[in-house]
Swiss-Prot record:
Expressed in adult but not in fetal eyes. Found in corneal epithelium and endothelium, lens epithelium, ciliary body epithelia, cellular layers of the retina and the sclera. Probably binds DNA dimer. Interacts with EYA3, and probably EYA1 and EYA2. It is found in: Cytoplasm; Nucleus. Residues 1-24, 34-61, 74-83, 617-646 have a biased composition (Low complexity). It is linked to Branchiootorenal syndrome 2: A syndrome characterized by branchial cleft fistulas or cysts, sensorineural and/or conductive hearing loss, pre-auricular pits, structural defects of the outer, middle or inner ear, and renal malformations. GO terms for cellular component: chromatin; cytosol; Golgi apparatus; intracellular membrane-bounded organelle; nucleoplasm; nucleus; transcription regulator complex. Coiled coil: none annotated. GO terms for biological process: lens development in camera-type eye; Leydig cell proliferation; negative regulation of DNA-templated transcription; negative regulation of skeletal muscle satellite cell proliferation; regulation of transcription by RNA polymerase II; spermatid development. Transmembrane segments: none annotated. This is Homeobox protein SIX5. Transcription factor that is thought to be involved in regulation of organogenesis. May be involved in determination and maintenance of retina formation. Binds a 5'-GGTGTCAG-3' motif present in the ARE regulatory element of ATP1A1. Binds a 5'-TCA[AG][AG]TTNC-3' motif present in the MEF3 element in the myogenin promoter, and in the IGFBP5 promoter. Thought to be regulated by association with Dach and Eya proteins, and seems to be coactivated by EYA1, EYA2 and EYA3. Changing residue 552 to M: In BOR2; affects Eya1 binding and the ability to activate gene transcription. Belongs to the SIX/Sine oculis homeobox family.
Amino acid sequence: MATLPAEPSAGPAAGGEAVAAAAATEEEEEEARQLLQTLQAAEGEAAAAAGAGAGAAAAGAEGPGSPGVPGSPPEAASEPPTGLRFSPEQVACVCEALLQAGHAGRLSRFLGALPPAERLRGSDPVLRARALVAFQRGEYAELYRLLESRPFPAAHHAFLQDLYLRARYHEAERARGRALGAVDKYRLRKKFPLPKTIWDGEETVYCFKERSRAALKACYRGNRYPTPDEKRRLATLTGLSLTQVSNWFKNRRQRDRTGAGGGAPCKSESDGNPTTEDESSRSPEDLERGAAPVSAEAAAQGSIFLAGTGPPAPCPASSSILVNGSFLAASGSPAVLLNGGPVIINGLALGEASSLGPLLLTGGGGAPPPQPSPQGASETKTSLVLDPQTGEVRLEEAQSEAPETKGAQVAAPGPALGEEVLGPLAQVVPGPPTAATFPLPPGPVPAVAAPQVVPLSPPPGYPTGLSPTSPLLNLPQVVPTSQVVTLPQAVGPLQLLAAGPGSPVKVAAAAGPANVHLINSGVGVTALQLPSATAPGNFLLANPVSGSPIVTGVALQQGKIILTATFPTSMLVSQVLPPAPGLALPLKPETAISVPEGGLPVAPSPALPEAHALGTLSAQQPPPAAATTSSTSLPFSPDSPGLLPNFPAPPPEGLMLSPAAVPVWSAGLELSAGTEGLLEAEKGLGTQAPHTVLRLPDPDPEGLLLGATAGGEVDEGLEAEAKVLTQLQSVPVEEPLEL
């Protein structure tokens, strides 16, 4: 053993440069021999002692002559490669030690020092060492060949699989010139599956192998709610974490509940996502009780239901309504069911119903549902009530015996009985303050000698985006004051757009069946309350009729202006005796009532006092007229931008009222010359046959030009005088004129 360090010192003393060159060329072999000597000393003391004695005897025989022989160092340097012979076990032990230490460079040099026969005859450690060296050198084809050459023990599968996948990733990155993402790596794993030599063939689905899944299923069949100790034992047995085991049981129970309820089955296994909830701390009874409320809340959230007395009626397919200047047809399943046919208002599908209760919305926020009273004497109802005057939202609870709160009610959990909580409510816009309403008795409106003049102002928020080419003009929310419109019983179903919960729109009681429908187009859902005619509320709905409603508005078709029944939303509707038979009503020229700018003559009723009129009221005597007639004008402010804004001049054709599209009633439509765009409705209240007069004001050069039929001559001298333009017949106007 002492000769090994003496030989290097003797070489330099001799001054031979050949020794230094030989030592440089055989550096790797010397390092490999030192590793082998260390390994031999560690294997056994007996074998190491025998080897040391043989080496000492050889050194003693060569020791006396070595200093005097100058050629002895080259011989000693050349003898170890030929004289040293290593067994396969020794080579495998060195390779295993270097593999565990992670010295890939030293392992590469050691394998290079081995004879070719030893490398080719290598055992499992030698093959794994060669695979690691091939991976470090970038020889991926050699790595794949080595891994597929023979099966490897299962203890080394994880290391070899990681080596194989890393080689695939590096090879793809070298080919693409960029780093791989998670999706790219997943595709590579699907494209290049693991070789069978380093894989047991057991497929892993969501981090769960077949054996682990079988053990979990066996435990689940015996106990669906294992204790924490049982979960830990399962995690140790299957090689999974405690979180994965808990998630698997939770997902399996949820799948069983979903499958029992007829829902779609979920995926096969859990995805292994971590969770902080441990269901083992909850009892089975608590979990079973919590399953049904969760499913019920999931079905109820996000839905709007309107309580009614009977089952929902079939929805008419032809229901439609004019909203914001366009027709909206109700097609498909409605989003809100009002126990009847769907009607779409501002993107919200509503419906018709004979008797409707208050609007009920489910409360959100994830709060638990209110528990029933243990006595069972009365059931508390929690509601959010919006006060239109103060704009506050009150949370109240009332007994079932108490009358229902008017307006929209939102069902939500709240505090104790009688407690009020003020808080904001999302997407709830309070309507205008409640105005005074004066319902009229059934029958004709008595004539009044002196009408009242009500100056008006344009209502805020009226849509002004109507283009001149718009085919439909909607005229809702024009007059905020109360008006009176008399309709005969022959009028078909009519739907009116209300402004909100504060609009005084009511339908007076009548002997015959009523056919006027009031539909609210307010922004907030709290303004939707359509109770029966006998129930108190903001609106009164009397015997609605199913079918296609008659839409209000103004349409331009084929050069003709068709004026439909356009009423302000703030009005009182009453029915009178049926009119004379026949749709054609005679026309007669009549002098228009002159009113100041912005004024309107209104025929008041005994139930309409002056104290509740809007604006400044002034009396004005009308011009001489027949004793049996009285004129009542529906006001339209001249400065209102929403009334026929910039309407183009159509070709000179007849201005007609379409009997097929609008109802016919005894009130006539007329345009007075006193104000711009003033629409007057004249009602015949005497013994003469009812008539309809249509008049136009004195327009500017950009205004409406409505003439007679084609070929008629225009009279230039009739600009300041209102004339009769057309009759309610299918014949053209006989007298040509122009404004």
